[in-house]
Amino acid sequence: NDTDPDRELYPEYAGDWWLVNSMIKESQLFFADLVVNNRPASGLIDSDYTFLDERLARHYGVDGLQGPVFKRTKLPQESPYGGILTQASVLKVTANGTVTSPVLRGVYVLERLLGYHPSPPPPSVPAVEPDIRGAATIRELLAKHREDPSCASCHAKIDPPGFALESFDVMGRWRDNYRSLGEGSKRIAGLGRSGNEFVHYIGSAVDSSGRMYKGEAFDGINEFKKLLLQDKEVIARNLVHQL
């Protein structure tokens, strides 16, 4: 699977099928609850509850659940989770297992949640390849990419949602720093879940701030959600089109 976590960078996830299955189940239960109980479409962006079992609760940093049975769980007030937008299943499939991609995640938010479809990139423009050695951040690489006038207008819309989600790793867990295979402030080595030896480094701090294409600034996922929720009609209309 192209989105399975890299065993060098994320050895703690190797073979964790309980987590993977729980991620899928959460999304199924949450969306069914949204539709069956006629809850507002804004719940796709943010909600004060989700459905968790012990493994997924631990992944999200939520205490108090034991065992494999899913329960409707109220999230802590300042939790970055809540809504489809920040569910681990979505965050996993919008990464490639090695690095997160603000572009993939940004396009997902625009297309699936807001109903806006960015134009495909010009064939002459190469894709942005993240630097897993840690020498340059994805934000720096995208800034250089936007210097091309043919890329700037679309990336002004795509990049901000992706930046807001950068505080979540390739499996949707909260992080404060990137990991790299080459450079960083701290070397981490050991044996992974599958018994493989690994070495990686704690890299630069994550920056999840940004500015929407209309000019509104945000610092982190919760402020970004509030900006999206200023236009609930767009979210509701797009949900109807998706069903």
Tell what function each PLM region has.
Residues 1-241:
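Active-site substrate-binding loop specific to GH73 endo-beta-N-acetylglucosaminidase modules
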